[in-house]
C-alpha cells in the first residue's frame, strides 16, 4: 500500500484591509497529514506551519470576497506559496514535504536501528 497525503488549512484565517479591499487573507496555517496502513497497523506523521501569502498587486476585478472563499482555494494559495518560497531558496516544495513524510513512515515501518540487550546482561541476576 502507498502513503496517503492529505493537505488542509486551518479555518482560522488572518485577514486585513489592504488596497481598499477588506478581509484580505494574508496568513494561514497549513497541515500535511500522511499515513500508511501495513498489516493492520497505521503509521502516520503530521506537519503544520503558518505561512504568509503574497498579497502584492491585488486585482479588485479578480478578488474573492471572504464570504466566498473555499478551503480548496485557500489551500491552493498556501501550496503555491510553499512552492514559490522553495524556488527562492526558502524551505522545501510540497512534493519534498510529501517525500519527507514517505521517508519517515518507511522508517516507522522498518526502523533502521534497534535496541537490544547487551550480551553480558542476563534475565536472572
Go through each PLM region and give its residues:
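A short, structured beta-strand/loop element
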Residues: 31-64
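Short, charged/polar N-terminal "headpieces" of proteins
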Residues: 1-44
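Acidic, low-complexity intrinsically disordered segments
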Residues: 57-125
Amino acid at each position: 500500500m502507498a502513503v496517503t497525503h492529505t493537505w488542509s488549512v486551518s479555518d482560522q484565517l488572518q485577514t486585513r484591509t489592504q488596497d481598499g479591499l477588506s478581509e484580505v487573507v494574508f496568513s494561514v496555517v497549513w497541515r500535511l497529514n500522511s499515513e500508511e496502513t501495513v498489516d493492520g497497523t497505521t503509521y502516520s506523521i503530521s506537519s503544520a506551519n503558518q505561512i504568509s501569502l503574497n498579497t502584492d498587486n491585488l486585482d479588485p476585478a479578480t478578488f474573492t470576497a471572504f464570504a466566498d472563499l473555499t478551503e480548496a482555494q485557500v489551500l491552493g494559495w498556501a501550496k503555491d506559496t510553499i512552492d514559490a518560497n522553495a524556488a527562492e531558496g526558502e524551505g522545501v516544495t510540497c512534493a519534498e514535504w510529501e517525500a519527507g513524510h514517505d521517508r519517515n513512515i518507511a522508517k516507522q515501518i522498518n526502523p533502521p536501528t534497534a535496541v537490544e540487550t547487551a550480551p553480558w546482561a542476563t534475565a536472572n541476576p
